[in-house]
Amino acid sequence: VLSGTDKTNVKGIFSKISSHAEEYGAETLERMFITYPQTKTYFPHFDLHHGSAQIKAHGKKVANALIEAVNHIDDISGALSKLSDLHAQKLRVDPVNFKLLGQCFLVVVAIHHPSALTPEVHASLDKFLCAVGAVLTAKYR
């Protein structure tokens, strides 16, 4: 459960990263595909090379979904309900991949905003990403 401080910390760090949605989203995906190559299996039709238009486009979708969750931080499940349905029922993404993506996103944020990612902000952002992952996997059966 996100505390008031967590919500403030998450909103604060996203105010710094929102304008870089496509860049950070693509970087996160590229990092995940390299670090955890098994995640590539969900993207057989993608050009997975650095800088590909498909990675940039999907990275922007990922980042925009996170921004949507931040904008509705008191109702993440409502904000991401359709995305949860898509991943659980149509795409059938292994739930562990959301944790891997979250870890890669944390690394990208740390690279670009090292002074802003204090231990407290890191903890809050990690809790937020876990909450998003829980919402996205809530409809799995």
UniProtKB/Swiss-Prot annotation:
Q: Which GO terms describe its cellular component?
A: blood microparticle; haptoglobin-hemoglobin complex; hemoglobin complex
Query: What SUPFAM superfamilies does this protein map onto?
Result: Globin-like
List of residues binding O2:
H58
**Binding-site residues, heme b:** H87
What tissues has this protein been observed in? Red blood cells.
Q: Which GO terms describe its biological process?
A: hydrogen peroxide catabolic process
Record keyword Transport present:
yes
GO MF annotations, alphabetized = haptoglobin binding; heme binding; iron ion binding; organic acid binding; oxygen binding; oxygen carrier activity; peroxidase activity
What keywords would UniProt list here? Heme, Iron, Metal-binding, Oxygen transport, Transport
| Globin domain location | 1-141
The residue range of the signal peptide is none
Q: Which InterPro entries match?
A: Globin, Globin-like_sf, Globin/Proto, Hemoglobin_a-typ, Hemoglobin_oxygen_transport, Hemoglobin_pi
Quaternary structure, per UniProt, is:
Heterotetramer of two alpha chains and two beta chains.
Name the family: Belongs to the globin family.
**What does the record give as the function of this protein?**
Involved in oxygen transport from the lung to the various peripheral tissues.
**The name this protein goes by in its record:** Hemoglobin subunit alpha-A
